[in-house]
């Protein structure tokens, strides 16, 4: 058998496999570096350099320059050219990351309504509750 003090290799060093004729002993090749179109300068298995991928950044889905190749429909509503689609804000959201409480929202709503009100000074003004709009009886 093999010598336990020889090291981690269970085969004695004098055993040489013929060039691939024995199915139990395939020709020596490193499975970490499979033959292929990968350039030899890029180390395989490095997450910074994925195997056989282009070194330039790949555009993200939904952004300009990206055409989805799958069966997925385009994002709705379609974004303007040159802009990525943005999700509509949830109710209560005013801007990106700004949430207003009910009290402040009510105050803002009131102020907004006020700014849209047309102040017409005349007979049909709804602000006056007195009946002075009718003609007076002084003859």
UniProtKB/Swiss-Prot annotation:
Annotated Low complexity bias: 125-139
The keyword Translocase is annotated on this UniProt entry: no
Main localization category: nucleus
Region ranges (Disordered): 1-139
Biased composition (Pro residues): 24-62, 70-91
GO cellular component: nucleoplasm
Keywords noted in UniProt: Nucleus, Transcription, Transcription regulation
Biased composition range(s): Basic residues: 103-124
Subcellular location: Nucleus
Superkingdom as given in the UniProt entry: Eukaryota
Functional note: Negatively regulates TSP1 expression at the level of transcription. This down-regulation was shown to reduce taxane-induced apoptosis.
Name of protein: Proline-rich protein 13
The species this protein was found in: Rattus norvegicus (Rat)
């Amino acid at each position: 058998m093999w010598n336990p003090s020889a090291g981690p290799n269970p085969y004695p060093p004098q055993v040489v496999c013929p060039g691939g004729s024995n199915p139990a002993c395939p020709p020596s090749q490193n499975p970490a570096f499979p033959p292929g179109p990968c350039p030899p300068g890029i180390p395989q298995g490095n997450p910074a350099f994925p195997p056989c991928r282009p070194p330039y950044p790949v555009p993200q889905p939904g952004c300009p320059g990206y055409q989805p190749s799958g069966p997925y429909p385009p994002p709705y509503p379609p974004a303007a050219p040159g802009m990525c689609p943005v999700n509509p804000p949830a109710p209560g959201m005013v801007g990106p990351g700004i949430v207003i409480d009910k009290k402040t929202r009510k105050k803002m709503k009131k102020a907004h309504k006020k700014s849209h009100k047309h102040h017409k000074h005349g007979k049909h003004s709804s602000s006056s509750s007195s009946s002075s709009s009718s003609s007076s009886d002084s003859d």
